[in-house]
Curated annotation (Swiss-Prot):
Species lineage: Bacteria, Pseudomonadati, Pseudomonadota, Gammaproteobacteria, Enterobacterales
Amino-acid positions noted as binding acetyl-CoA in the UniProt annotation, renumbered to this chain: A380, N386, Y387, S405, A423, R440
Gene: glmU
HAMAP family: GlmU (MF_01631)
Pathway annotation from the record: Nucleotide-sugar biosynthesis; UDP-N-acetyl-alpha-D-glucosamine biosynthesis; N-acetyl-alpha-D-glucosamine 1-phosphate from alpha-D-glucosamine 6-phosphate (route II): step 2/2; Nucleotide-sugar biosynthesis; UDP-N-acetyl-alpha-D-glucosamine biosynthesis; UDP-N-acetyl-alpha-D-glucosamine from N-acetyl-alpha-D-glucosamine 1-phosphate: step 1/1; Bacterial outer membrane biogenesis; LPS lipid A biosynthesis
Region (N-acetyltransferase): 251-456
Record localization: Cytoplasm
SUPFAM superfamilies, A to Z: Nucleotide-diphospho-sugar transferases, Trimeric LpxA-like enzymes
Source superkingdom: Bacteria
Cofactor: Mg(2+)
Catalysed transformations (reactions): alpha-D-glucosamine 1-phosphate + acetyl-CoA = N-acetyl-alpha-D-glucosamine 1-phosphate + CoA + H(+); N-acetyl-alpha-D-glucosamine 1-phosphate + UTP + H(+) = UDP-N-acetyl-alpha-D-glucosamine + diphosphate
Species this protein is from: Escherichia coli O81 (strain ED1a)
Keyword Metal-binding: yes
Protein name (Swiss-Prot/TrEMBL): Bifunctional protein GlmU
Length: 456
């Protein structure tokens, strides 16, 4: 069906006392992203014309965390219920648009479910998201007559008979803007909590002869809210299990799906293998036949075909061409780039550095602000000294250079093609092509020398 224009209201004013945190509840993260950000993203994907965020506690923290989102900030100075929260946003509703109500602490609601709810909303009526629970204790019950929804009764206000109802309200609903404003103006706080319930608009709509259509989510986890860290951790595992299942069905071999975390977006080729306890953050692309060892963290990086990343390696904002090998225990920091067939071994760190085709840095090395050519050997213990305490400087190493172990290259410095740097050398001046650079202290040997003896 053809949908009206739609705006979304996200309720995010709660303090989250049971989180025992100085951070507003909705800013606690699930899969590396604030819970409320999941909801904002869903609203935007659904095509919301406006997103109204109702906030209360921790407003400054919320505005700082969500500064890049195009939000209309609506203050709820007193937390007097969900109906009161919606009343604060009501002046911003257009009469001819639909208003979808969501919650900042219900992070896993899917766009697919919301679209079905939107499509199901009857003209002049309400679309309501409900679920059936074996134990509905504590939740508002859906009342019906002859199968038609007539209202919602909160648990504290329900009779014993009503408490036997298993269909409960999720709090998510959609209605026309003009209707919503009219119903919100009629709300009272005559209930056990002394609050203004948004759920009372269901009975108001029914009294006007309006139709209320109930829709069920695809998964219960979509409508589960978070009030404490235990609930958040459970939803985290639900989310991660769903992501792992999608990847497995798409051909990615996860050695143990229960020990894999996706905290962003993973684009992948064929025959990718990921071992246990791997974390993927941000936007990551893995080419064909990539292998990632246990304990690795990959963030905002592109890994080319046939690359192998050995255990306990951290890769962040890096680009690897085909057939590179890294680790174990290596660290590629932002700006690291490996060309085809390059190798970075254990305890090697790279930052804003390029390692050319077939070049190798096998172990115990720091390469920062460096441009390294093809077929270069970087010996163990090599350090590019790129920082003078105030500014960073660049090291340039040409093709086919051999850098011996325990070498320091004091930037800015250039080493020409084919040069050799002897082990233990401190390079402070440019080295010409095919030259040998050596700066060792001359070795002294004392024959018959005896070690000191400790005095008694």
């Amino acid at each position: 069906m053809l949908n009206n224009a739609m705006s979304v209201v996200i309720l995010a004013a709660g303090k989250g006392t049971r989180m025992y945190s100085d951070l507003p509840k909705v800013l606690h993260t699930l899969a590396g992203k604030a819970m409320v950000q999941h909801v904002i993203d869903a609203a935007n994907e659904l095509g919301a014309a406006h997103v109204h965020l109702v906030y209360g506690h921790g407003g400054d923290l919320l505005k700082q965390a969500l500064k890049d989102d195009n939000l209309n900030w609506v203050l709820q100075a007193e937390q007097l219920g969900t109906g009161h929260a919606m009343q604060q946003a009501a002046p911003f509703f257009a009469d001819d648009e639909d208003i979808l109500m969501l919650y900042g602490d219900v992070p896993l609601i899917s766009v697919e479910t919301l679209q079905r709810l939107r499509d199901a909303k009857p003209q002049g009526g309400i679309g309501l998201l409900t679920v059936k629970l074996d134990d509905p204790t504590g939740y508002g019950r859906i009342t019906r007559e002859n199968g038609k929804v007539t209202g919602i009764v909160e648990h504290k206000d329900a009779t014993d008979e009503q408490r036997q109802i298993q269909e409960i309200n999720t709090g998510i609903l959609i209605a026309n803007g003009a209707d919503m404003k009219r119903w919100l103006a009629k709300l009272t706080n005559n209930n056990a909590q002394g609050e203004y319930y948004i759920t009372d608009i269901i009975a108001l709509a029914y009294q006007e002869g309006r139709e209320i259509v109930a829709v069920h989510p695809q998964r219960l986890s979509e409508v589960e809210g978070v009030n404490n860290r235990l609930q958040l951790s459970r939803l985290e595992r639900v989310y991660q299990s769903e992501q792992a299942e999608k990847l497995l069905l798409a051909g990615v071999m996860l050695r143990d799906p229960a020990r894999f975390d996706l905290r962003g977006t993973l684009t992948h080729g064929r025959d990718v293998e990921i071992d246990t306890n791997v974390i993927i953050e941000g936007n990551v692309t893995l080419g064909n036949r990539v292998k990632i060892g246990t304990g690795c963290v990959i963030k905002n990086s592109v890994i080319g075909d046939d690359c192998e990343i050995s255990p306990y390696t951290v890769v962040e904002d890096a680009n690897l061409a085909a057939a590179c090998t890294i680790g174990p225990f290596a660290r590629l920091r932002p700006g690291a780039e490996l060309l085809e067939g390059a190798h970075v071994g254990n305890f090697v760190e790279m930052k804003k550095a390029r390692l050319g085709k077939g070049s190798k840095a096998g172990h115990l090395t720091y390469l920062g602000d460096a441009e390294i050519g093809d077929n270069v050997n970087i010996g163990a213990g090599t350090i590019t000294c790129n920082y003078d305490g105030a500014n960073k400087f660049k090291t340039i190493i040409g093709d086919d250079v051999f850098v011996g172990s325990d070498t320091q290259l004091v930037a800015p410095v250039t080493v020409g093609k084919g040069a050799t740097i002897a082990a233990g050398t401190t390079v402070t001046r440019n080295v010409g092509e095919n030259a040998l650079a050596i700066s060792r202290v001359p070795q002294t040997q004392k024959e018959g020398w005896r070690r000191p003896v400790k005095k008694k």
